[in-house]
């Protein structure tokens, strides 16, 4: 699950840009989402919520692995977390829990 101890800093974000709700920034790690324009070290702004729509990029807690950033995909009645890099495989949603939905990416220069 998301760890409160991992909080490094609290910042105020303008409601006019990001809306209301509980938000947090996550450092992207690895190359599984490069096809979506999210690179290792980028900051991803996440809205805390437990539900997602088909195509959303989500943070999910995967049993035995921890948190991961992937695209939420529905194929018929089956739901997967889909990496945006062909060298990785889909993760069945039954093995994980949605923590939030990505709403913005801040690139590191």
What are these regions (language model features)?
Residues 1-35, 65-67, 74-78, 89-91, ...:
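Short, positionally conserved secondary-structure boundary motifs
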Residues 38-39, 52:
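Short, well-ordered loop/turn sites that connect or cap secondary structure elements
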Residues 41-42, 56:
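Structural motif
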Residues 52-59, 67-70:
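Short, Lys/Arg- and Gly-enriched loop/turn segments at beta-strand edges
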Residues 79-84:
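Short, solvent-exposed secondary-structure boundary/capping segments
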Residues 96-103:
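Structured surface patches comprising rigid loops and adjacent beta-strands/short helices at the edges
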């Amino acid at each position: 699950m998301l760890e409160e101890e991992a909080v490094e800093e609290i910042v105020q974000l303008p409601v006019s840009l990001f809306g209301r709700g509980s938000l947090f920034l996550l450092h992207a790690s690895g190359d599984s989402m490069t096809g979506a324009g999210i690179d290792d070290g980028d900051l991803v702004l996440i809205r805390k919520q437990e539900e997602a729509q088909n195509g959303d990029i989500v943070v999910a807690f995967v049993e035995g692995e921890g948190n991961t950033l992937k695209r939420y995909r529905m194929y018929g009645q089956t739901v997967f977390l889909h990496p945006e890099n062909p060298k990785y495989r889909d993760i069945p949603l039954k093995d994980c829990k949605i923590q939030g939905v990505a709403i913005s990416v801040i690139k590191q220069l």
